Amino acid sequence: MDESNIRNFAIIAHIDHGKSTLADRLIEECNGLDKREMKDQVLDSMDIERERGITIKAQTVRLVYKAKDGQTYYLNLMDTPGHVDFSYEVSRSLAACEGSLLVVDSSQGVEAQTLANVYKAIDSDHEIIPVLNKIDLASSDPEKVKLQIEDMIGIDASESLLVSAKSGVGIQDVLEAIVSKLPSPCGKSDSPLKAILVDTWYDTYLGIVILLRIKDGVIKKGMKIVMMSNNAVYQVDNVGIFTPHKKIVDQLSVGEIGFITASIKELSDCKIGDTITEEQRRCDAPLPGFRTSHPVVFCSIFPNEAGEFDRLREALKKLQLNDASFTFEIEVSNALGYGFRCGFLGMLHLEVIQERLEREFNLDLTATAPGVIYKVTTKSGEIREVHNPHDFGETQDIANIKEPWICATIMVPDQYLGVIMSLCNNKRGEKLDLSYSGNTALLKYRLPLSEVVFDFYDRIKSLSKGYASLDWEMDEYLDSEIAKLSILINSEPVDALACIIHKSKVEQRGREICLRLKDLIPRQQYKIAIQAAIGGRIIARETISPYRKDVTAKLYGGDVTRRMKLLEKQKKGKKKLRSIGNVNVPHNAFIQALKIID
């Protein structure tokens, strides 16, 4: 295939600005699917993506377009996620392309994730075509949005394309702009194979499938390939493309994006960003890989049935293959049994993984309170990274604790600026900058990550009636007043309910958990003490009173000492029960208490 007729491009935008709908129209225009097969969000393959109206996994499709100049072009489209948790997917997609369609909702304007994604595209040396979507809405204001793009992003928006992806207006103009304005890929077909591994996933029938972009050379069935990071050798079984259906082809050459299967059994051999070359004719040096994405939010996941542990482990392995940023390791809890400590890119990422485990693998799960990574320095000088309360150690042995902070960019209409700033201040934030573009404020804050990952995104959406948008990136670790909150039931610590929290909020949280447990734990024949503690100091306590059996019911008249003797005997019996009895905490009580910790 002549690489001058290939165009590789990504669609980037803020969440809900119409990326996936635009992709649907491009596929429809190029006859990628017939009318019967077309459906909304055709590239969003997971049910959860369609239900939430979001893109989670970057998807690729090859379109064949007959342009007005009479030539046939092969367009490799990468649809990317818009939510901040999945920005790593965007980075990988951009590395496989030469250009980007920057989609902006013409009624909403530039939003925080728009800025973040377009800067990634600029860093990747992309040619960028601004596309103003939803022009059929009454609130659409294309001229205002063009000025906003030039003011905030600094690219020429005078020739922005005006489209309505929903109704199909302007789709032909988008396709013509792609072939005329975006560059074709560069490379040498006679050079040794050099391809970058863009993504992997597990297919029930094909095993591990690799999505790659060919930089130099060709790849074909039967060829022996090498993963340059670990020298693992495999023989290619199948070569194919997505149209968006899987289609087997003879080979992939320079500039093409497609998939291969090679009977790969080891997940560790498939590293995202790795360079693939030919065994007999290796390339000189590997391609620069992607920036490694590290988890920032951690929580423990336990099966509600002990016999489901192995099924959960296999399910996590399959999800990890499809999501390199997701990590897990075995964990044992006294209260919840065997499970896994899992790492995620954010709370939406956590919710999506948990929902996929429950839906796709039919697992019934309990998740503990999410947390972030703290850097703990002990008095002996040892520095440890801690994300599990169980590993926190004793308070008296700790010299210093640092917590991760982020730089948050919030775009909000000026009428909601006051409530958003109040929220940031309540979250221990530090204001860095405030600027305006028209009646939109661009607010920059430095915030503790632990305050952002839980409900911050939902809160700014709620306070601004849905108009505010958020993007953030890691900043640095700073000294902080952090404590481990332990929950004790009859003086026995419950590991599943422990959490790491800022000292300013620890008493309130401790009281809330104790009150919730008091309502949830059934009464016993003896008194139950529920306590919240920091180290050896009790900061909150609730008591569940015991059942009382009337041991004097059979007495009538007689000596009062007989009555006192029976009551004293009952008192001693309850004391003995309390010292040897384990409190039966219902599984539901853990789940409800964990919701408070969240």
Swiss-Prot record:
This is Elongation factor 4. Belongs to the TRAFAC class translation factor GTPase superfamily. Classic translation factor GTPase family. LepA subfamily. Keywords: Cell inner membrane, Cell membrane, GTP-binding, Hydrolase, Membrane, Nucleotide-binding, Protein biosynthesis. Required for accurate and efficient protein synthesis under certain stress conditions. May act as a fidelity factor of the translation reaction, by catalyzing a one-codon backward translocation of tRNAs on improperly translocated ribosomes. Back-translocation proceeds from a post-translocation (POST) complex to a pre-translocation (PRE) complex, thus giving elongation factor G a second chance to translocate the tRNAs correctly. Binds to ribosomes in a GTP-dependent manner. The gene is lepA. Its EC number is 3.6.5.n1. PROSITE patterns: G_TR_1, G_TR_2. It is found in: Cell inner membrane. The keyword ATP-binding does not apply. It is an enzyme of class 3 (hydrolase). GO terms for cellular component: plasma membrane. Residues 4-186 form the tr-type G domain.
